[in-house]
From Swiss-Prot:
Any single biological process term in GO: glycogen biosynthetic process
Pfam families reported in the protein's UniProt record: Glyco_transf_5, Glycos_transf_1
Assigned protein family: Belongs to the glycosyltransferase 1 family. Bacterial/plant glycogen synthase subfamily.
Top-level class of the enzyme under EC nomenclature: transferase
Assigned keywords, A-Z: Glycogen biosynthesis, Glycosyltransferase, Transferase
Recorded catalytic activity of this chain's protein: [(1->4)-alpha-D-glucosyl](n) + ADP-alpha-D-glucose = [(1->4)-alpha-D-glucosyl](n+1) + ADP + H(+)
Record-listed ADP-alpha-D-glucose binding positions: K15
Full protein name: Glycogen synthase
Single Gene Ontology MF annotation: alpha-1,4-glucan glucosyltransferase (ADP-glucose donor) activity
Length: 476
């Protein structure tokens, strides 16, 4: 089975969020299931020389966009069994950022057209195309509307429904090359919506966790598409993301100062490293709580700013925060750190090496998200044997079971309602167990056995692909 993944970013080449992490690890897991996997993505201008020097030009051709034909280079290389293809066009992709330009509709219309034009030149013709997020959302629509000579089935994955690729209606006529009767399949509230086009036309829709698949069918989480998603629920599946266990391994991670596995003595040494780096008192006995996050409302940062002062004045605890985002939230965290310099430290940067050290050195990790389609940080936290405290939403609900001392089960702590009181109470509850050695050891044993890799999910994707292709054979 040949499966082509289409996405706008992929680790380690380009990354702005969790999509890149998924595309960096899922294909390798699918290869272990016996699938022949390739990935195609834009070749942005800041591709490092390490990768640039390995690329070979497969084919060059022109792609029609608006009234002009644009150059397209198809470049490729193979790494760890995955064939990576890059769509090269400097006009659209050699820019400072990956996203956020006025011609976004034209850029990613070109990308979708270029992917379809590339299909005859790939080493293996795909039996199925797996598209990710709105930037590849036109491909399922082209496959189902007679625009492609030899159409193949498509799977479309929603990584975050908030980002939909909505543009003025003129885009339909000027860019998309669809017949007029297909307008309704892409129109949403007077705009052309790339993501809606994918939902309507793909053979299957997946989300990145089972709970998120249910949540997005409600007005609270559906971002205006809940009605359509409820209508299409029969073809929608929630398949939990995983993390790359080879990449995220505290025993081999080059960023971890004292490598460890199931060894709290070495982990405490890493805590001292964090205390030093974050300029906090070096105390082994004080619980260290960490947060690594984009500093935005949806990540629950306002809950943290509400309770941080009370937390550190009523509990003997340290708080280390790493991330950037909303300037007002950054200012609030700077202010809290200035008020409590011996207990709160905030570094307004994002650096992967420092984040890895923080996962390794912290005792507890907080994720009070308002919504979280899947979340990878709680999985990394489990992998680094750091106890997560999460709000019960999306993938957080699916991965973290709140500790129950009566039966000794659970791999973290969680709260249901999005409010500061419940968040503070849950942190205090976790701290109570931290100070009870027997309970904490039992909790850590549960964490050691938590499954956060891709094996289970890769099998679910494989079964989904086989179901689609089997159905197609029957129909043929």
């Amino acid at each position: 089975m040949n499966v082509l993944h289409v996405a706008s970013e992929c680790n380690p080449f380009f990354k702005t969020g969790g999509l890149a992490d998924v595309l960096g690890s899922l294909p390798k897991a699918l290869i272990k299931q016996g699938i022949n996997v390739s990935v195609i993505l834009p070749k942005y201008g800041h591709l490092s020389d390490e990768w640039q020097n390995q690329l070979t030009l497969k084919k060059s051709f022109t792609v029609s966009v608006t009234w002009r034909n644009q150059y397209c280079g198809l470049e490729q290389f193979v790494d760890q069994g995955v064939t990576y293809y890059f769509i090269d066009n400097e006009y659209y992709f050699k820019r400072e950022r990956l996203y956020g330009y006025l011609d976004e509709a034209e850029r990613f219309t070109f990308f979708n057209h270029a992917v379809l034009s590339s299909l005859p030149f790939l080493d293996e013709s795909p039996d199925l195309i797996h598209c990710h997020d709105w930037q590849s959302g036109l491909i399922p629509a082209y496959m189902k509307t007679g625009s492609v000579e030899n159409p193949v089935p498509t799977v479309f994955t929603i990584h975050n429904l908030r980002y939909q690729g909505a543009f003025p209606p003129d885009v339909f006529r000027e860019l998309l090359h669809f017949a007029p009767e297909h307008f309704a399949g892409l129109e949403m509230d007077g705009a052309i919506n790339f993501l809606k086009g994918a939902l309507v036309h793909s053979d299957r829709v997946t989300t990145v966790s089972p709970t998120y698949a249910q949540e997005i069918q409600t007005p609270a989480f559906g971002e205006g598409l809940h009605g359509l998603l409820h209508q299409e629920r029969g073809k929608t599946r929630g398949i939990l993301n995983g993390i790359d266990l080879e990449d995220f391994d505290p025993k081999t991670d080059p960023h971890v100062t004292y490598p460890y596995k199931h060894n709290q003595m070495e982990k405490r040494k890493n805590k001292q490293v964090i205390q030093r780096l974050f300029e906090l008192p070096e105390r082994k006995d004080i619980p260290l709580i960490a947060m690594v996050s984009r500093l935005v409302e949806e990540k629950g940062v306002p809950l943290l700013t509400q309770i941080a002062g009370e937390l550190v004045t009523t509990e003997n605890v340290q708080l280390a925060i790493l991330g950037t985002g909303d300037p007002s939230l950054e200012d609030q965290l700077h202010h809290l750190a200035s008020l409590h310099p011996h207990q709160i430290s905030f570094k307004c940067v994002f650096a992967e090496p420092l984040a890895r050290k923080l996962y390794a050195g912290a005792d507890l990790f907080i994720m009070p998200s308002r919504f979280e389609p899947c979340g990878l940080s709680q999985m990394i936290s489990l992998r680094y044997e750091t106890v997560p405290i999460v709000r019960e939403t999306g993938g957080l609900y699916d991965t973290i079971q709140s500790y129950n001392e009566e039966i000794g089960e659970g791999n973290g702590f969680s709260f249901t309602h999005y409010n500061a009181h419940d968040f503070l109470y849950t942190i205090k509850r976790a701290l109570r167990f931290y100070r009870t050695e027997k309970e904490w050891e039992n909790l850590l044993l549960n964490i050691y056995s938590s499954e956060v890799g891709w094996d289970v999910s890769a099998k679910q994707y494989t079964a989904l692909y086989e179901e689609i292709l089997g159905k197609r054979k029957v129909e043929a």
